[in-house]
Regions:
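Short, non-transmembrane alpha-helical segments in secretory-pathway proteins
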Residues: 33-97, 160-162
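N-terminal Sec-pathway targeting helices
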Residues: 1-15, 24-26
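A short, surface-exposed interaction/processing loop segment used at functional sites
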Residues: 117-162
Length: 162
């Protein structure tokens, strides 16, 4: 009899805890403020260029190197290399110079990558790279399938006209 009473009390206590947890979780959800719609991205009217080659030229050229003749949704942001590398690939890099972080979409295959014999080349729907502001040298490059929706955390994002 005593055991039945203890088990009954335990069951009631568990039910109350589960109900309280569900109420707490749902209250938290209802109080969240929905994220505002992203502001339209301004198309850059002037692009950085070095020795007659613009940032757009660099993006289109590297897309072509990776098999994509018509990349879409090309964007860039002026930032520092440390911040860009951390966002784009989670890396800590050896310099923190001013740079442009560039992201574009398409179907990319890096056939120029060094890889073991028989290995498949890197592929991705997103190309991300970092270009040094001072001379246009590409310091970082990668392919993946990430959208980089939070590129605006690095600064003002601008679109590159197709």
């Amino acid at each position: 009899m005593k055991r039945r009473r203890v088990l009954g009390s335990l069951a009631v206590t568990c039910a109350v805890l589960v109900a309280a947890t569900l109420v707490f979780v749902n209250v938290g959800r209802s109080q969240r403020v929905p994220k505002a719609e992203a502001a339209p991205i301004e198309i850059a009217t002037t692009l950085p260029s070095w020795n007659g080659m613009s940032l757009r030229d660099t993006a289109v050229q590297w897309a072509a190197f990776c098999g994509e003749e018509h990349p879409t949704d090309m964007r860039f942001v002026e930032t520092t290399r440390q911040r860009a590398a951390k966002l784009l690939d989670g890396a800590k890099v050896d310099s923190d110079n001013a740079c442009y972080a560039v992201v574009l979409h398409g179907n990319f295959v890096d056939t120029m990558a060094f890889m073991p014999y028989g290995a498949q080349p890197p592929r991705g729907t997103t190309m991300a790279f970092i270009v040094r502001s001072s001379d246009g040298a590409m310091t970082d490059f990668g392919l993946n399938d990430l959208p980089y929706a939070d590129l605006d955390t690095l600064g003002t994002v601008k679109a590159i006209a197709p």
